[in-house]
Amino acid sequence: LEHSLSVTRLCDKISGNYEFLNRDLLISCAMLHDVGKVKELSEFPRNDYTDEGNFLGHIVMGYEMVMEKIKNIPDFPPIIANEMGHCILSHHGELEYGSPKKPAIAEAVALSMADNIDAKLETLRECFEAKDTNDWLGFNRWLESNIRRTSF
């Protein structure tokens, strides 16, 4: 939930800087981009992947959940449904990162980048909290870099 809120805040800032972005679409998709995780993961305290989560993943599951809700909204514009679906399906940005599609519209690019920014900075924050030092913290496989805290 904190991640989705952070991504939404980033997208709000981005939309204010790039006026050609459809802010309503971007913010809606930012709030919903990881909704599939509620079905992908089991309940606390187990927090393990469900069978459906292992088979489909949160991206596909989230897309299906959102599309199902949209079907129940009378006269929902099909183009907006397609754009929302695309943003959700492409939010990891690359096929090798689990997205079934690469971003093809500006809002999908912005969402993918905001998601990536938040995930990477959160990873750094966790590394910094784990070791209270200004020394090099070692190689982080996800960030693909040897990291250290800024000296300030």
Named regions from a protein language model:
Residues 31, 112, 137-141, 150-152:
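N-terminal intrinsically disordered, cationic/polar leader segments
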Residues 1-9, 35:
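All-alpha helical catalytic cores of prenyl diphosphate-utilizing isoprenoid enzymes
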Residues 147:
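Active-site cofactor/co-catalyst pockets and adjacent glycine-rich loops in catalytic enzymes
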Residues 13-131:
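Divalent metal-dependent catalytic cores for phosphoryl transfer on phosphate-bearing substrates
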Residues 125-143:
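Compositionally biased, low-complexity linear motifs
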